[in-house]
Every structure is written in structure tokens, then in C-alpha cells.
Design a protein with these regions (language model features):
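Short amphipathic alpha-helix that is part of the acyltransferase structural core
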Residues: 1-14, 46-49, 54, 105, ...
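Conserved GNAT acetyl-CoA-binding A-motif
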Residues: 74-83, 220-233
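Conserved active-site alpha-helix within GNAT-family acetyltransferase domains
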Residues: 87-101, 206, 210, 234-252
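A conserved beta-strand-loop-helix scaffold within acyl/acetyltransferase catalytic domains
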Residues: 150-200
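Conserved beta-hairpin
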Residues: 25-28, 92-100, 167-181
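Conserved acetyl-CoA-binding loop-helix of GNAT-fold acetyltransferases
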Residues: 59-68, 199, 205-220, 244
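Acyl-donor-binding surface of acyltransferase catalytic domains
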Residues: 56-133, 256-258
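N-terminal charged segments
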Residues: 1-74, 86-87, 152
Length: 262
């Protein structure tokens, strides 16, 4: 029986892989800054990755000050990073500096050999026509799409850039000929990361998300992966969905975010 706990590090690492795809990575003291040129205003377009916890813990106040100044000089709209396995002192320092945080729960599942009985299908977004049509999925929707505001055209441009140069694939979720939403995957060794599951409001609560996660389990098997996983914001509908899908909550990380003056 596969011990899913050992894939928790792969799930955490998959976020760093995602943020680096299509990004310009600049070394800073204690971290790297991953920026996607022209799309820095998106949350995933400007973020600190590969944070060196030892450097931060030993000099956290000065690190926060100098890093904030550097990002402001570069014109970054925010300072955003993920932390886990840290002492209480650093989160306290971040809160004092005006950072907001949220907990993301990491769910892991086992590949499934049998193809699930599903009414939905996944169409990979590959051609120029596919990408040009994809922003229509988000039109008419008010509020954040993936937890953050962002123009649909820009979000799709970010997806396209990341999908064009690495192990990431993006799919449109279809029911018959109707497009209901989208989802992406990233291959990280023997692990399959599921990313950015989105359903239009009129298709939520109809069991489509559960079918998609079942398809992800079978896709992981087809790709000969040992496990697959995804993150959900604590207390969100996604957390309930992944629990219903049989995935196990086996790790977590905390996102820290602070807008910067420009």
C-alpha cells in the first residue's frame, strides 16, 4: 500500500515548480523572486520562492525590511511567500509588518487504475484557437476567480506561458459540448500536481468537481505516477470537495501576502 505521507514534500515543491514556470528568477538574500514579465500584477506573476528559512529566522526583521525595499524598487505590487515548518516568531513578525495570511491544506490521493464513470471530459488547451477562446470561461464572473482578482485575458496569458515551456498542461472541462470550467496538471517526477480547478458558478454543486478529481486519479495512473495532490484554502468549498473525493489532508502551508506601495 502506498504511504501517501511521503509525497507531502512533492506537493509542497510542486508550488515552487509552478511559480518558476515562465518566470524570470532573480536571486535575493534568503530567497528567489519569480516574476513573469508583464504579468506581475497577478498573484502568481510575482512571488518569493525557495525561501531559506535559516537565513530568515536568524535575521528576520532586517530580512523583511531589505526584501520589501528591494521589491518596491523593482516595482512589484506585493510581497508574497509561502511558509511551513517554521517557528512562531516569523509569523508574528510578518503580522507585525502588516502581512495577511491564509492556510492552505494539501490533499493527496492514490492513482486509480479503473476509468471512472463520468459524464464530463477534459479537452487539453493546445492550439492558438483554444487559448484565444479560454478567457470566455471567466467572462461575466464577479469577484476573484482563483482567490485573487485579475483580468481573464491576463490570467489565461499566464497559463499559456507556463503551459508552453514545462511539465504543465491546461484542460477545459466539458459536459457534452458545454464548457464548464478548467483545470491544470503539473508532472513533478512520480507525482502529479492538480492545479487551479475552476468551475463556472452555474456548474458548481452539480458533482462535476468530484468527477474531475476522479479523472485526475485515473490520469495519474495512466501517467504512471505514484500519487497526485492539490491544495485547498482551509474552510473553503474546495476542502470539502477533495475530502468527498477520498483525498487525505496530509500537509499544509501558509501563504503570506502584503501589498506594496508603488
Amino acid at each position: 500500500m502506498t504511504d501517501l505521507t511521503r509525497f507531502a514534500p512533492a506537493l509542497l515543491e510542486s508550488d515552487m515548480v509552478y511559480f518558476k514556470l515562465g518566470a524570470r528568477c532573480t536571486p535575493l538574500r534568503g530567497a528567489w523572486l519569480a516574476r513573469v514579465p508583464g504579468l506581475e500584477h497577478l498573484a502568481a506573476g510575482c512571488i518569493l520562492v525557495d525561501v531559506d528559512m535559516l537565513q530568515i529566522e536568524s535575521d528576520r526583521e532586517n530580512w523583511l525590511e531589505t526584501t520589501t525595499q528591494t521589491l518596491e524598487t523593482l516595482g512589484c505590487p506585493r510581497i508574497r511567500l509561502y511558509l511551513y515548518d517554521t517557528s512562531p516568531e516569523l509569523p508574528s513578525a510578518l503580522e507585525t509588518q502588516g502581512f495577511q495570511s491564509r492556510c492552505e491544506i494539501g490533499f493527496l490521493g492514490k492513482p486509480c487504475a479503473s476509468r471512472p464513470d463520468c459524464s464530463v471530459t477534459l479537452h487539453q488547451v493546445e492550439t492558438d484557437a483554444d487559448w484565444k477562446a479560454k478567457p470566455q470561461l471567466y467572462h461575466g464572473i464577479t469577484g476573484p476567480t482563483f482567490g485573487y482578482q485579475g483580468p481573464p485575458d491576463d490570467w489565461v496569458a499566464l497559463e499559456r506561458r507556463k503551459s508552453s515551456i514545462g511539465p504543465m498542461k491546461t484542460f477545459v472541462i466539458q459536459l457534452d459540448q458545454t464548457r464548464c470550467g478548467s483545470v491544470s496538471t503539473i508532472e513533478v517526477g512520480t507525482f502529479l500536481r492538480v492545479k487551479s480547478l475552476f468551475l463556472r458558478p452555474e456548474w458548481q454543486g452539480k458533482g462535476i468537481g468530484l468527477q474531475v478529481m476522479n479523472l485526475m486519479g485515473h490520469l495519474a495512473y495512466q501517467l504512471e505516477k505514484d500519487a497526485f495532490g492539490i491544495f485547498a484554502v482551509a474552510g473553503s468549498a474546495a476542502e470539502k470537495l477533495y475530502t468527498r473525493a477520498g483525498l487525505l489532508p496530509l500537509t499544509q502551508q501558509h501563504e503570506w501576502n502584503k501589498p506594496l506601495s508603488r
